[in-house]
Amino acid sequence: MSEKNKQNDIKVIATNRKAYHDYFIEETIEAGIELKGTEVKSVRLGHVNLKDSFARVENGEVFLYNMHISPYEKGNIFNVDPMRDRKLLLHKHEINRLAGYVQQKGYTLIPLKIYIKRGKIKVELAVAKGKKLYDKREAIAKRDAELEIRKKMKEYLR
C-alpha cells in the first residue's frame, strides 16, 4: 500500500447501531473531538461506548454528552471522568447550520461513529429526527419482507 493511501485510511473504533433504529438520519457531518491524553489511548484501544450519547449546541460551541470512554488502565492519576462532556471541533458556519436544524422541533444531534482518520480521532455526527413506534414497526416489516423476497429468489435460482 502506498504512503498516500495509508494516510487516508479510516479505522472505525465504535458505531452507534441503535441510532439507525431509533432515528431518521437527515444529514451527517464530520467533527473533531477534544480529548485528554489518556482518553486518546483508551479510544485507540476501542474502549468507547456511544449508546445514549447526544450532542448539543451551547454558546456557539458543540458538546457531546453521555459518551463513555473507559479509563486507560495505565493512566492512574491522569485519568478523567469517563462520562465527562467533550467539546466537538467544528467551523463556525457548521455550528450555525447545526444550530438551525436543532432549533426545529424534533431534531437532535447524535454521534453515529467514532473513527481514526489520518491519525486524528473524528466523530460522525448526524442531524436526526426521532422515530415513532409505528415507524419502527414499519421498518422491521419492510426489512422482513425484503429478506423473504431474497430467500424466495435464492430458492428459485437454485
UniProtKB/Swiss-Prot annotation:
The keyword Cytoplasm belongs to this UniProt entry's keyword annotation: yes
HAMAP family registered for this protein in UniProt: SmpB
Similarity remark: Belongs to the SmpB family.
Function per UniProt: Required for rescue of stalled ribosomes mediated by trans-translation. Binds to transfer-messenger RNA (tmRNA), required for stable association of tmRNA with ribosomes. tmRNA and SmpB together mimic tRNA shape, replacing the anticodon stem-loop with SmpB. tmRNA is encoded by the ssrA gene; the 2 termini fold to resemble tRNA(Ala) and it encodes a 'tag peptide', a short internal open reading frame. During trans-translation Ala-aminoacylated tmRNA acts like a tRNA, entering the A-site of stalled ribosomes, displacing the stalled mRNA.
Localisation per UniProt entry: Cytoplasm
Keywords: Cytoplasm, RNA-binding
Domain of life per record: Bacteria
Pfam families (UniProt xref): SmpB
InterPro entries in the record: SmpB (IPR023620), SsrA-bd_prot (IPR000037), SsrA-bd_prot_CS (IPR020081)
Name of the protein this chain belongs to: SsrA-binding protein
Native source species: Caldicellulosiruptor bescii (strain ATCC BAA-1888 / DSM 6725 / KCTC 15123 / Z-1320)
Gene Ontology cellular component terms for the protein in this record: cytosol
GO MF terms, alphabetically ordered: RNA binding
Any one biological process term the GO annotation gives: trans-translation
The keyword Plastid belongs to this UniProt entry's keyword annotation: no
Gene3D superfamilies the UniProt entry points to: 2.40.280.10
